[in-house]
Amino acid sequence: MPSDMLQFPSENDRQTFERLVSELPDLIHKRCHDYDELYGHKLLEEGPAEVAKFYSKDHAHALLFKFLKANAFSYEGAVKQLVSTLNWRREFQPLKAAFAEEHDERLMAAGYISYDASAAPNTRTVTWNLYGKLGACKDLFADQDTFIRYRVGLMERGLQALNLLDPDNCSMTQVHDYKDVSVWNMNADVKKCSRRVIAIFQDHYPELLYAKYFVNVPTILRWVYDVVRAFVSEETSRKFVVLNDGTKLAAYFAGVPAAYGGTAPATLAELPKPASRPSPYALFLLQKHISEELD
């Protein structure tokens, strides 16, 4: 939402936000190697005109607010997480994972992003993760980066469907479907990758999740949910819902396929999708990377 509409629990929290805004340039220059991109948005109103034009105060402030909220408006906590996130993005290059890299088609078949502009608040953008399909590509988990770059890329594409200035579409919903998953196809490599992904999302994507549904989870696999809870904050875990029967998902939000108890198109592939194009600043950075690689 626009900067003047941000809601602070107290005047002290507002002052903490203003401090972070004022000290952000120094933080980025001194502790983040000048890297100022966050989820495709520019955090600083600096640089040549052709770069500075990508800055939006409202978007930058909305993102800073999320980091503060995730840390109970602790300045030190928010700064630590923000600095860590910007340095991770500078090194990992998640925008490239989302828009410039090709991923194994077996992985691509295990994840979908749907978008319904008429859906209830913050259920418009949904990422679907079909873990049962990963049993056919366990070989890909031996190199953890293969799966992690795919999974982060899916997350980043989903973020492009959000509108940080719209309180009804500033967070996403996630569905993790464990149909056809058994203890036999969750080997050590899969578990290690899962833990790394959970840690990445907890550390570097604060306040972007509205709700997460674990569906078709057999009792014998409840440990998966327990592992996830162990890696996330209590605030995040309160957004989790576990459903043994996937057809009950329709009771929580509309627009889901028949397999989940809804009346939408029969398959996830038929659900309406967002454009998922990179933001203007993300596109500029991607083109810059390509140009530098060619040089």
From Swiss-Prot:
UniProt keyword terms in alphabetical order: Cytoplasm, Endoplasmic reticulum, Heme, Iron, Lipid transport, Membrane, Metal-binding, Microsome, Transport
Q: Which SUPFAM superfamilies match?
A: CRAL/TRIO domain, CRAL/TRIO N-terminal domain
Q: Could you tell me where this protein is found in the cell?
A: Cytoplasm; Endoplasmic reticulum membrane; Microsome membrane
GO biological process terms on file: Golgi to plasma membrane protein transport; phosphatidylinositol metabolic process; regulation of establishment of cell polarity; regulation of exocytosis
The cofactors required by this protein are: heme b
Species, as recorded: Eremothecium gossypii (strain ATCC 10895 / CBS 109.51 / FGSC 9923 / NRRL Y-1056) (Yeast)
Q: Which PANTHER family match?
A: PHOSPHATIDYLINOSITOL TRANSFER PROTEIN SFH5
Query: What does this chain do?
Result: Non-classical phosphatidylinositol (PtdIns) transfer protein (PITP), which exhibits PtdIns-binding/transfer activity in the absence of detectable PtdCho-binding/transfer activity. Regulates PtdIns(4,5)P2 homeostasis at the plasma membrane. Heme-binding protein that may play a role in organic oxidant-induced stress responses.
Q: Which reaction does it catalyse?
A: a 1,2-diacyl-sn-glycero-3-phospho-(1D-myo-inositol)(in) = a 1,2-diacyl-sn-glycero-3-phospho-(1D-myo-inositol)(out)
Residue span, CRAL-TRIO domain: 100-268
Tell me the protein's name. Phosphatidylinositol transfer protein SFH5
Tell me which GO cellular component terms the UniProt record holds: cortical endoplasmic reticulum; cytosol; endoplasmic reticulum membrane; plasma membrane
Principal location listed in the UniProt entry: cytoplasm
What is the recorded membrane topology of this protein?
Peripheral membrane protein
Q: Where does heme bind?
A: 131, 151, 176, 178, 212
* SMART domains, per the entry: SEC14
Q: Which GO terms describe its molecular function?
A: heme binding; metal ion binding; phosphatidylinositol transfer activity
Q: Which family does it belong to?
A: Belongs to the SFH5 family.
Asked if the keyword Heme belongs to this entry, the reply reads yes
